Amino acid sequence: PTSTLNILHGENGSGKTSILESIHLLASGRSFRSRNLEPLINSDKDEAVVFARLLDGKEIGLSKSRRQKHNLKFRSEKQSSWENVARELPCQILDSNSFLLLEGGPKSRRHFLDWGVFHVEHSFVENWRRTKKSIANRNHLLKHRSPDLSQIAAWDSELCLAAKEVHRAREEYFQVFLPLFLDLYRKMNGVDVDALIIEYERGWDADRELEDVLLESRGIDVRYGATQSGPHRADLSFKIGRNRAVDILSRGQQKILVSTMKIAQGLLLSQALDRKCIFLVDDLP
């Protein structure tokens, strides 16, 4: 071990990935291998416990039992969410699933973008929660056989206010992130940087206000029982010329692209907050 690098080595099944998973679980409340946390508890135990002491002396503890919800503590105080811990322990995972950033659906790319925004703009969390609440209530109304249009209109207004702030924060972050990434990508010997086009798509028509889009698409939304436009539909597009980057790049080139994006995100966090990002690298293929 050194001050900046730790290498875990051992036989297959010796627990190397489990250590990385414990750090990631403590930092985010999620496993990078499974949506279900139950397998993290040893078969002969009723509870899993993870504890960490940071360099500045702050302590983080997490326990998860089979019969109860998790119990998260930061500086000896119980936490109702991971917000404080996530800010204190920023982690990026690089593993075989990292390719989902290119190959997967928009959700993985939104998560990537929002991870960065979360760490540099504290108001983002509250605006995103407002957005989620508005969409959930709007969708609930849309599923009714005879939707109350006045209530839908009220949630439209709330959604548009929150969505405006979410979009602003994402766009501002992306404009700072992109040149930093491209500069690093050149140094990583990727494909011709000038041929690579990465764009942020906000989730509704770029030339129209969300209010107008929601009003016009209300009939479609009622038919599907879900809101079709908004920040929950945002995405990042990767192209080489006119083609999707994932269809052009080799597996090795995709690895360089995805790894560089995550490293660039960590560098941007360090520049903005003077805090180091923890990179967990697990058996890249």
State what each model feature region is:
Residues 31, 143-147, 271:
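Short, flexible helix-adjacent loops and helix caps
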Residues 16:
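Conserved lysine of the Walker
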Residues 1-11, 24-25, 37, 53, ...:
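Conserved NTPase motor "head" modules and their coupling/switch loops across ABC/AAA+ ATPases, GTPases
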Residues 45, 49-52, 139, 143, ...:
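Alpha-helix boundary/capping detector
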Residues 99-190, 201:
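An accessory alpha-helical subdomain
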Residues 282-284:
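Walker B catalytic acidic pair
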Residues 24-108, 114-124, 175-183, 196, ...:
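Nucleotide-state sensing region of NTPase/ATPase domains
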